[in-house]
Amino acid sequence: RSTEYIAILKKILNLLKNSKLEYLKASDESNLSKDKRHFNLQSTLRNRYFQDVTKLLRSLNVEVENLVIHRLNFEQMVISSIKKPNHTHLHKSIELDQNLLRLYDEALELNSAAFVLKTHREKIAESVSEGIYFLENAGFILES
C-alpha cells in the first residue's frame, strides 16, 4: 500500500515538472501580458507543488534527487508535441493537469490525511476549468 502511494507521488512529481514547463511555454506563446502573468503564476504554483511533493516523499524516506533527473518523460513530451502541432502549450498543460487530477485522486484514496495533496488538487482543478474556459473563448475545441 505504501509502495503504491510512493509510486503515485513519483508520477505526480514527473507530471508537475512537465506541467510547469508547458505553462512556461504557454507564457512565451502568449501575446497578452495578463495571460503571460497567469501562465507564469501557474508555472510557479506547479514548482511549489513539486517542492511540497518532494518534501512528502522525503518524509517517507524516499531518495528524491535520483528521481528528478529522468529525461525520458521530457523527451516523450517533446515527441508527442511534435506529433500534434495544432495543440497549443496551454492545451498540453491542461492535458497534463487532468492527468495530475487523476493521480491526486489515487494518492488521496491511499492517504486521505495528506492535506497538502487536497489543496494541490483543488487548485489544479480550478486551473483546468480556467484553462478550458480560456481555450474555448479563443476558439479551441477540446476533446475530452
Q: Which residues fall in each region the model found?
A:
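Membrane-interacting alpha-helical segments
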Residues: 1-6, 81-86, 138-144
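Alpha-helical bundle segments that constitute or directly flank the non-heme di-iron/ferroxidase center
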Residues: 1-30, 87-112, 126, 130
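Inter-helical turn/loop segments and adjacent helix faces that build the functional surface
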Residues: 25-37, 106-119, 141-144
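Short, charged, amphipathic alpha-helical segments
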Residues: 36-45, 91, 117-123
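Conserved alpha-helical segments that form or flank metal/cofactor-binding pockets of metalloenzymes
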Residues: 36-68, 131-143
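Short, highly charge-biased, low-complexity peptide segments
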Residues: 61-65, 115-116, 123
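Hydrophobic alpha-helical segments of small multi-pass membrane proteins
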Residues: 73, 123-124
